[in-house]
Amino acid sequence: MSDTEEQEYEEEQPEEEAAEEEEEAPEEPEPVAEPEEERPKPSRPVVPPLIPPKIPEGERVDFDDIHRKRMEKDLLELQTLIDVHFEQRKKEEEELVALKERIERRRSERAEQQRFRTEKERERQAKLAEEKMRKEEEEAKKRAEDDAKKKKVLSNMGAHFGGYLVKAEQKRGKRQTGREMKVRILSERKKPLDIDYMGEEQLRARSAWLPPSQPSCPAREKAQELSDWIHQLESEKFDLMAKLKQQKYEINVLYNRISHAQKFRKGAGKGRVGGRWK
């Protein structure tokens, strides 16, 4: 050993001996401080010195044990948190799976309901189309029957009345002036006296119905023709008045049917048939 090491070793030995003596020596009672005279309080507060806690004698503190217990406690808390986290995560996953299953079930139910509604709507549209077609067929059949009845009634009125209606329908679309109407009416009423082709015997036979007291003359024959034509016109007028009355009655019946149908028709506004029939 060198001189320096020996000197250090000799210095350490008295220090160790002094430390052992201090540990073995009983603690001396602290001297009681005598009460001092009151001093004036300082303007600034005095912070007392920090005194470390005294460790009781005879008890040794094992810091390793404290650290180990603290580590065990932290580990237990961490393990508890991990278990709670995984339980919460498992619960959330179960809820998510249940939510997905509920969504899929709801989606399938909604698709089934939509399919059912589509089928119902298709059936309803088919029924409406069938009902509409049936009504149209009934209306067409009814119109055909009415037309047949009208044609039968018109055919029973006479050939002259039918001819007059045909002429009226043909000339209804063309509007005539007053002069043209007068010329047309006079031409229809005034028939030309054609006797050029008749012989003497035919003229005698034509005038045979006259009374013997009255001589045969062209003016009398013309008056008789005009009288017959007036009778024919009166007959046609009577037939036309009867037909007009029948048409007014049919129009009133149709108007009442339309009004009755519009009252009970669903989803339609108020209808109105124009015109006024007396």
Curated annotation (Swiss-Prot):
<feature type="region of interest" description="Disordered">
    <location>
        <begin position="1"/>
        <end position="63"/>
    </location>
</feature>
<feature type="modified residue" description="Phosphoserine; by CK2">
    <location>
        <position position="2"/>
    </location>
</feature>
<feature type="region of interest" description="Disordered">
    <location>
        <begin position="105"/>
        <end position="153"/>
    </location>
</feature>
<dbReference type="InterPro" id="IPR038077">
    <property type="entry name" value="Troponin_sf"/>
</dbReference>
<keyword id="KW-1057">Nemaline myopathy</keyword>
<keyword id="KW-0514">Muscle protein</keyword>
<feature type="compositionally biased region" description="Basic and acidic residues">
    <location>
        <begin position="105"/>
        <end position="149"/>
    </location>
</feature>
<dbReference type="InterPro" id="IPR027707">
    <property type="entry name" value="TNNT"/>
</dbReference>
<dbReference type="GO" id="GO:0045932">
    <property type="term" value="P:negative regulation of muscle contraction"/>
</dbReference>
<comment type="function">
    <text>Troponin T is the tropomyosin-binding subunit of troponin, the thin filament regulatory complex which confers calcium-sensitivity to striated muscle actomyosin ATPase activity.</text>
</comment>
<protein>
    <recommendedName>
        <fullName>Troponin T, slow skeletal muscle</fullName>
    </recommendedName>
</protein>
<dbReference type="InterPro" id="IPR001978">
    <property type="entry name" value="Troponin"/>
</dbReference>
<dbReference type="GO" id="GO:0031014">
    <property type="term" value="F:troponin T binding"/>
</dbReference>
<dbReference type="GO" id="GO:0005523">
    <property type="term" value="F:tropomyosin binding"/>
</dbReference>
<dbReference type="GO" id="GO:0005861">
    <property type="term" value="C:troponin complex"/>
</dbReference>
<comment type="similarity">
    <text>Belongs to the troponin T family.</text>
</comment>
<dbReference type="GO" id="GO:0003009">
    <property type="term" value="P:skeletal muscle contraction"/>
</dbReference>
<comment type="subunit">
    <text>Interacts with TPM3.</text>
</comment>
<keyword id="KW-0225">Disease variant</keyword>
<dbReference type="GO" id="GO:0005829">
    <property type="term" value="C:cytosol"/>
</dbReference>
<dbReference type="GO" id="GO:0031444">
    <property type="term" value="P:slow-twitch skeletal muscle fiber contraction"/>
</dbReference>
<dbReference type="GO" id="GO:0014883">
    <property type="term" value="P:transition between fast and slow fiber"/>
</dbReference>
<feature type="compositionally biased region" description="Pro residues">
    <location>
        <begin position="43"/>
        <end position="55"/>
    </location>
</feature>
<keyword id="KW-0597">Phosphoprotein</keyword>
<dbReference type="Pfam" id="PF00992">
    <property type="entry name" value="Troponin"/>
</dbReference>
<feature type="compositionally biased region" description="Acidic residues">
    <location>
        <begin position="1"/>
        <end position="37"/>
    </location>
</feature>
